[in-house]
Amino acid sequence: MAPCDDKASQSNPEEVAATHVSLLMDVDFDTQVIQATAQYEVEIVADGATAFILDTSKLTIGTVTVDGEPARWVQHRRHSIYGSALDIRLPTADYSKGQRLQVKISFCTSPRSTAIQWLPPAQTYGGKRPYLFTQGQAIHARSLLPCQDCPSVKITYDANVTVPAWATCLMSALESAAPVTAAKGDKRTFSWKQVVPMPSYLVAVAVGELESRAISSRCKIWSEPGVVDKAAFDFSQTEEFLAAAEGLAGPYEWGRYDVLCLPPSFPYGGMENPCLTFVTPTLLSGDKSLAFVIAHEISHSWTGNLVTNRTWEHFWLNEGWTMWLERNIMTQVTGDPEYYDFDAMQGYRSLQDSVSLFESTGALALTKLVPDLDGVDPDDAFSSVPYEKGFALLNELQRRVGVDAFHAFAKEYIKEFRRSTVDSDEFKAFFLGKFPDKVGQLMDFDWDAWFYNPGMPTETPTFNRTLCEESEGLADTWANAARGEVSEVADAQEAKFAAWTSPQQVTFLQRLVDLSSSETDKDGAIAVTFSLPLLQAMDKAYSLTKTGNSEVRFCWHKLCLRAKALFIVPHVLDFVTSMGRMKFTRPLYRELFTLGGDARVTAVNTFKERASFYHPICRTMVAKDLMVDLDEGPRAPKRSLSLASLGMSRTSSDVNFGASIGTSAATETAAGAASGATAFLRELSSGLRREDSVSGGGGGGGGGAGGKKWKVAAVVGVVVVAAAAVVVGRARRG
């Protein structure tokens, strides 16, 4: 394993590294915990290693053994970002490099785990059964299981997961045996195995009332019974995308490629969990127009999952490459040679938006392609920068060496680093080594400026604008009408708009948003103010308020809020309280907040009332955006737990450990099963939990914050948002 300095992990893979983990998990919806054991196979990397250190967050540790014997261990003082290091002392310091050990840990998760969202029946489509799903990226896997939670450590895993008999369990792996029903008939156990090494952030679990539809021999679409057919229709091109990706990147190594369409609180557009991509239901447009997200997630099967950024500072190697692959897949599948340039232009625009927002919040340093993340939560640095600035770098290299040569290089790059990790310097060296005959074309390529300069790239790309011009031309027609203070346009071209692809419609609306944002837009055009009658005429022509396309709906809402057209506010509230996709929720909450007055108050109150609906990651980020301090106390369990029910006992070796470890700096120690489980039971019985149920969906007419009547409020000015994190334009995690 290549050495690395991972600032986001407290583990020690440079001394002792995990290679495989066997998981036994028991999912308890009543208490909202997973009781589990993790048996690690580890390898000594450095002679004389004395400890195996893992990352944990909000986990209760029960017992620890090394090669079957009780081990000394401690959970150190909790770091506010990185959690608590689990320090397991090895029985001797005489280990040599290459030796292998087995380390077994019993533990249980917390209802406050940031990796797990527990949904009550009311938050599911069916409304009758609870649901859970996990999200490990970037550094949340440590709240699902003790792990070396850094991308540089790649492991294989197997798992046996016990769930209620009515439920189906899915994981980021291949099913290794048929489900087994318990003798009492109240539970089933599902078995999984992942043979391709992967980082811990890709360990994923979903449990719910699920059905599947086959798309091909290696692709299924999973979702709740009432949604699965819609999802199967919208994602019916999955096999076609996968075949196109293989032509560009090489053989698909993961066996199956299934898709799970999750409940609406899933915080991202998609997550590339191996063998089982998670996606948001906001992609279900009914016309397959948002299926490009599937192409993005499929691309990650090579760039991100097979070849992985070594640390989060080099995240662009995951996402920039994936944008490049996605755009090539979609160009091939659509048969439109202009798709690549058109989509790249939209990505460049989202990069400009991200840079502007980071600059306004005083966090421009996070727009470096290789940022310094020391002391920074990787979630706070998340934006379109690694996606689109990373893509821009690759696209510029492609321009210099030629398209065919770069396509061949992409395959060689993936082959060279498959099942491994890579950083920016290694990528640079590998690229230059493959093009010794292109010295002239690459001589003035400033690698350091690309990697370490904040802001936009110094080299502005040139793209074919043909597909853009139609959309922007119609937008300019409406803008000219606004400048002329008329209430409609002579020719709204309704039929043309309806025939456009989703990205073209978004381009039209985004152009109008840009024109209404400042004194001049990104192209220097003078800004305009859109009157209420003009917006109503636009809505009548294109049915924008009623659209089922989430991307179009989002842009329309932004445009109306920028124009202070408060008729849209109830619709915005309905949107942000009906789904938790951060690409949409965060900007719309910020837009409401920026309006000031009643809009700001309503944004804050709505979020507070609905906070438990959102995934913990989304909840945390929106709270930062709105400067809200949420009580993150645990929820009260429906029934109590005992040490025995957790599979833990008060053994003498566990209890004596606290003394044998000496004077550790730990304040939050777990001296074994007794102290760990007892602390957990105290936490569970503290009564501090917030109820996770929600009431209704925020309803169209009155809006989720309460059906107060709206009045025009004076604009209090632009509020500088505290959080630096920005949404991804239209890329996968958005």
Model-found features: residue ranges?
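Acidic/His-enriched low-complexity segments
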Residues: 1-255, 382-385, 401
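Short, glycine- and charge-enriched coil/turn segments that flank and shape catalytic ligand pockets
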Residues: 46-48, 94-98, 179-187, 286, ...
